């Protein structure tokens, strides 16, 4: 199936962060999204958390996991994402990032409004307790 947007995320030893990050991606207001996760063979329970979330989330059926044979690092994981994304647009986020529920919708609307091939958004630093700095 061809999607409008692919949200891609590498997974490697991010157990403390991956649930909040993945849920922020899955809970987007934009509908036509493929989720592409690259299992970069970490040694913690990150992938157990990922499998639990996608088994229960309504958008879990839109998640594709690519298993690396062994840990290859962030750059290799990103190359795998680019090579395997089926969306017209690709949004790469790290597995400790959290995006607002309307992030993809806003970025998509701006891309269409200005007829551009690439767009970047701003960010803010925030602790896991919610403090912004």
Regions found by a protein language model. Give the residues of each.
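Nucleotide-sugar donor-binding/catalytic module of glycosyltransferases
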Residues: 1-133
């Amino acid at each position: 199936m061809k999607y409008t947007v692919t949200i891609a995320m590498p997974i490697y030893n991010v157990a403390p962060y991956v649930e909040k990050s993945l849920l922020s991606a899955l809970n987007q207001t934009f509908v036509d999204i493929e989720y592409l996760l690259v299992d970069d063979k970490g040694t913690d329970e990150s992938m157990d958390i990922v499998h639990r979330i996608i088994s229960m989330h309504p958008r879990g059926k839109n998640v594709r996991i690519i298993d690396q044979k062994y840990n290859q690092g962030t750059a290799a994981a990103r190359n795998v994402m680019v090579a395997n994304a089926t969306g017209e647009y690709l949004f790469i986020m790290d597995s400790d990032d959290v995006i607002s529920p309307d992030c993809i919708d806003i970025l998509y609307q701006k891309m269409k409004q200005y007829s551009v091939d690439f767009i970047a958004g701003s960010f803010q630093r925030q602790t896991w307790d919610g403090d912004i700095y």
